[in-house]
From Swiss-Prot:
The glycine cleavage system catalyzes the degradation of glycine. One of its GO terms (molecular function) is aminomethyltransferase activity. This is Aminomethyltransferase. The lineage of its organism: Bacteria, Pseudomonadati, Pseudomonadota, Gammaproteobacteria, Legionellales. It is an enzyme of class 2 (transferase). Its EC number is 2.1.2.10. Keywords: Aminotransferase, Transferase. It catalyses: N(6)-[(R)-S(8)-aminomethyldihydrolipoyl]-L-lysyl-[protein] + (6S)-5,6,7,8-tetrahydrofolate = N(6)-[(R)-dihydrolipoyl]-L-lysyl-[protein] + (6R)-5,10-methylene-5,6,7,8-tetrahydrofolate + NH4(+). The gene is gcvT. Belongs to the GcvT family.
């Protein structure tokens, strides 16, 4: 049976085209994916991301546990109200999921996980928590909205209660705050500034309608995908999975090697891979002729094994096709992409195309 978020009837009332997304009935768009994309780049858009998995890790052993569970080190969080992006790996260094962890208190951490990996992630975290002074609480009674774009925070502040305004207006990127059972984080998945807001299910429809009346554009999964691709943000299950490591996914920066005795899960395998050198790397591709790059297409590199496009689409901002691809480390500045049997040249660059709405 397909799952529905508390906003399901609201999406239908807004004219959403609904699609199945890993067992959830979610909006693909509300009439124009292109307009929704541009709204986020130039103004403000909102996404229902209540399908995401919210897990609170409670107890005195929370920090110690997360230092073992994650490749990034939560010891970098120096005070409550800070957030950290990380991979969660298996013993072989394969990526089980990528996530954001928020420190709400010294004994209270919140992690937001991908919906497609909900069962496996929760089971993994629960199994690995044995022996630590922690308890896990999956928060299915909460909904989550992402409000993104250069005007997202200003428009959100215009509809919030005074106590919320005071708390949210001082947030800097990758900070969070709790106010009256509402949780605000200055994080997102679009490459733009904005907020992710977690509220009890019974409040989310009013929040959505208030944002709509403030001029925030409803946006679906289609725009979310092109926005994150332009920003070089990876999609779990496409750009990385348990067969790939952070080092070959452009995520080495999320692995903290020191101190050596931290011994996070997968550390031995990743240290070995680092010492031996990776054979594949993540790059960005820009198509130099007509066509659209898509997931699964071959990347032809002279004198090397083929690479593979992990994510590809048309970029509404750049008005050309862009892609993320995993290729041999020897890959040079130009490759060929096999698009329906035609070999189309593409320029190789960094796996990021847009920063704060501007070409990189």
């Amino acid at each position: 049976m397909t799952a529905k978020t508390p906003l399901h009837t609201t999406h239908l009332a807004c004219g959403a085209k609904m699609v199945d997304f890993h067992g959830w009935d979610m909006p693909l768009h509300y009439g124009s994916q292109l307009n929704e994309h541009h709204a986020v780049r130039n103004d403000a858009g909102m996404f229902d991301v209540s399908h995401m998995t919210i897990v609170d890790i409670l107890g005195a052993g929370g920090r110690q546990f997360l230092r073992k569970l994650l490749t990034n080190d939560v010891d970098q969080i120096t005070h409550n109200g800070k957030a950290l992006y990380s991979c969660m790996c298996n013993e072989h260094g394969g990526i089980i999921d990528d996530l954001i962890v928020y420190q709400r208190a010294s004994d209270n951490y919140r992690v937001v996980l991908n919906s497609a990996t909900r069962q496996n992630d929760v089971a993994w975290i629960r199994a690995k928590s044995e022996g630590f002074a922690v308890g896990l609480q999956e928060r299915r009674e909460l909904s989550m909205l992402a409000v993104q774009g250069p005007n997202a925070i200003a428009k959100t502040l215009s509809i919030l209660a005074p106590a919320h305004v005071d708390a949210v207006s001082t947030l800097t990127p990758f900070e969070c705050v709790d106010v009256d059972h509402w949780f605000f984080a200055r994080t997102g998945y679009t490459g733009e500034d904005g907020l992710e807001i977690i509220v009890p299910n019974e409040f989310v429809t009013q929040l959505w309608n208030d944002l709509l009346n403030a001029g925030v554009t409803p946006c679906g999964l289609g725009a979310r995908d092109t926005l994150r691709l332009e920003a070089g943000m990876l999609l779990y299950g496409q750009d990385m999975d348990e067969t790939t490591t952070p080092l070959e996914s452009g995520l080495t920066w999320t692995v903290k090697w020191e101190p050596e005795d931290r011994g996070f899960i997968g550390m031995g395998a990743l240290v070995s891979q680092k010492q031996q050198g990776i054979k594949r790397k993540m790059v960005g591709l820009t198509l130099l002729d007509k066509g659209i790059m898509r997931h699964g297409q071959k990347v032809i590199i002279e004198g090397c094994p083929d690479g593979i496009i992990t994510s590809g689409s048309y970029s509404p901002t750049l008005q050309q096709s862009i892609a993320l691809a995993r290729v041999p480390v020897e890959t040079g500045e130009q490759v060929l992409v096999d698009i329906r049997g035609k070999l189309i040249p593409a320029k190789v660059g960094k796996p990021r195309f847009i920063k704060q709405g501007k070409p990189v």
